[in-house]
Amino acid sequence: MTTILKHLPAGQRIGIAFSGGLDTSAALLWMRQKGAVPYAYTANLGQPDEDDYEAIPRRAMEYGAENARLIDCRKQLVTEGIAAIQCGAFHNTTGGLTYFNTTPLGRAVTGTMLVAAMKEDGVNIWGDGSTYKGNDIERFYRYGLLTNAELQIYKPWLDTDFINELGGRHEMSEFMIACGFDYKMSVEKAYSTDSNILGATHEAKDLEFLNSSVKIVNPIMGVKFWDEEVKIPAEEVSVRFEQGHPVALNGKTLSNDVEMMLEANRIGGRHGLGMSDQIENRIIEAKSRGIYEAPGMALLHIAYERLLTGIHNEDTIEQYHAHGRQLGRLLYQGRWFDSQALMLRDSLQRWVASQVTGEVTLELRRGNDYSILNTVSDNLTYKPERLTMEKGDSVFSPDDRIGQLTMRNLDITDTREKLYGYAQSGLLVTSSATGLPQVGSLEKSKVAE
């Protein structure tokens, strides 16, 4: 069976991920006119720039959908977002600022939940608005086929017939008007935006040029913290975790995880927390640039990692970062539910997140400027009395440290001998300008002493 259909399968049911925007509206109407039977599926992902979700399926029916459904994906999306925080599943960072993989998380949930809904309706052909140059075409392909092994893919934007007739936004708008729908194109922004409850992605158009900065972006989840005219008073906030799960903000327990994320977004958004400018590597290895918002994810991540570093030992923290980065890349590639990702995720949640219990108090200021004011946890292995510089009972003595340092002589001697060997073979050039000017002049016998 051919998985990808290059031309419209007339007479067959086609599920389309319907956003209500011009592209998917024109595509749905065009498919109906060409003889297909379109079914519209809209994901409620808690998009901060969407005012009326209930109106979207109604518009789909007006444009010719056989049926239109609104699928509430918010609970599952927040669940996956919290899991990503627990695992540190983020691999794109610049100057200490993190991209929280909010779009890949959204695609994992959308791709599985919408295709599952289509399968319930006997719809086994799926179309969406992703283009052939981006990441989403592969993410949706993977998640769709994972959910329904019988799935076929039809994308109007890969169909030459559709492109020849309605290849641009102007043509789509004229098509809608000619068909009796007073559809006016929205005012073109200098960039495109994709969002969900976890975060927003701004990219393309003017943002493709690196001399266009964050200053051209109008945040939809926060404030323009770079604008000095925007007043942003400092705010103290506390975040509490129990076994790796955020349970309270400012001492208030929220009714569910969705409300928790919404409140975290409101708090972080008041300061512009979690905005970052990233150059990343797409799945096809071409670089792209995006400006991201994720105020709630950032707030929870900061508090979570503060507790984690005070609770776990160095080797565990090292594995958390290494495995989290690996997991983040798998998530970015559309492999969040692959076996290798599940293996990493399970170990990080089981052995790392389960011990992260406590409360962190922060002062938020402008943008990503904040201070940690207090960290409290019964699980802390940070114990100041162990290393105090004041007199008193100590867990180890000066003689203990002398013995420990003496044992280091073994590997120091081995290292010195290897450096000598490197210098003798010419691999290590020593001179007065290097940090090891004396190595090359050492006698072999002295090195071995």
UniProtKB/Swiss-Prot annotation:
It catalyses: L-citrulline + L-aspartate + ATP = 2-(N(omega)-L-arginino)succinate + AMP + diphosphate + H(+). It holds the Pfam family Arginosuc_synth. PROSITE patterns: ARGININOSUCCIN_SYN_1 (PS00564), ARGININOSUCCIN_SYN_2 (PS00565). One of its GO terms (cellular component) is cytoplasm. Pathway: Amino-acid biosynthesis; L-arginine biosynthesis; L-arginine from L-ornithine and carbamoyl phosphate: step 2/3. ATP binds at residues 17-25, 43, 129, 131, 136, 194. It comes from the Bacteria. Its EC number is 6.3.4.5. L-aspartate binds at residues 131, 135-136. One of its GO terms (molecular function) is ATP binding. Its main location: cytoplasm. SUPFAM superfamilies: Adenine nucleotide alpha hydrolases-like, Argininosuccinate synthetase, C-terminal domain. L-citrulline binds at residues 99, 135, 139, 192, 201, 203, 280. It is found in: Cytoplasm. GO terms for biological process: argininosuccinate metabolic process; L-arginine biosynthetic process; urea cycle. Keywords: Amino-acid biosynthesis, Arginine biosynthesis, ATP-binding, Cytoplasm, Ligase, Nucleotide-binding. Belongs to the argininosuccinate synthase family. Type 2 subfamily. Homotetramer. This is Argininosuccinate synthase. The gene is argG.
